[in-house]
């Protein structure tokens, strides 16, 4: 998908925003994430055309009750992403070396603590976690929903501060020997807000002896006049050049 039509000319979507697209897959729902590259508003048509760039390389399953498009209002990092490396000591003496922190025991894959407090992330909202695959190192995306939100003070990895802990319907991915550098690769898109879609306009003129309407209209009968409004297609006819003698 490279473009969308949104209802209303004054849409609250701007270039650079992330959009989560949820679509049916037959037995459930799949999701993908896109970035807005262009917004073209039309006050006359009361809608906006949005062009999109692909971020997630493939769709992933998500727990949802309906299809929809959501703008992700917050893009944040997990707590500890900016922690300095852990200094190494022996018998209380600094050895002059540093190493990566082991993941704290509280770092369950069903929980994720953000690096700052966010009161606008709500239960049942969507969340997208982008991270390195701990096995291959390639980028991967996890699509889920927030099942609980807790605001708390956190002290880990030589840092202390306020954070927001999310309980997740679908956990992020780690290995038994994963370290803090895995969280450093992670970006979390949250605070989802549904946006209304508009019908895709016809890119060709209305013509012919039949006309399909978008809904059932009571009272239509043979012989009743109809009025069709819109711009008339302009056609320029070029006369052929005379044949040379």
Feature-to-residue mapping (PLM):
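Intrinsically disordered, low-complexity, polar/charged repeat-rich segments
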Residues: 1-245
């Amino acid at each position: 998908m490279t473009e969308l039509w949104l209802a209303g000319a004054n849409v609250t979507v701007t270039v650079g925003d992330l959009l989560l697209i949820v679509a049916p897959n037959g037995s459930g729902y799949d999701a993908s994430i896109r970035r807005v590259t262009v917004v073209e508003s039309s006050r006359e048509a009361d809608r906006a055309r949005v062009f999109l760039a692909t971020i997630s390389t493939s769709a992933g399953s998500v727990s949802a009750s309906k299809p929809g498009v959501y703008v992700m209002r917050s893009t944040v990092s997990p707590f500890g992403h900016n922690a300095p490396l852990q200094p190494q000591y022996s018998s209380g003496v600094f050895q002059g070396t540093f190493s990566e922190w082991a993941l704290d025991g509280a770092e369950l894959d069903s929980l994720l603590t953000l690096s700052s407090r966010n009161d606008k992330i709500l239960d049942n909202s969507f969340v997208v976690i982008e991270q390195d695959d701990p096995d291959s190192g390639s980028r991967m995306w996890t699509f889920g929903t927030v099942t609980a939100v807790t605001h708390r003070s956190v002290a880990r990895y030589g840092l202390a501060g306020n954070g927001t802990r999310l309980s997740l319907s679908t956990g992020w991915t780690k290995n038994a020997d994963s370290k803090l550098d895995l969280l450093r690769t992670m970006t979390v898109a949250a605070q989802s807000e549904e946006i209304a879609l508009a019908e895709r306009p016809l890119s060709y003129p209305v013509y012919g002896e039949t006309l399909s309407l978008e809904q059932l209209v009571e009272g239509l009968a043979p012989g009743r006049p109809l009025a069709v409004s819109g711009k008339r297609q302009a056609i320029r006819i070029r006369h052929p050049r005379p044949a040379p003698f």
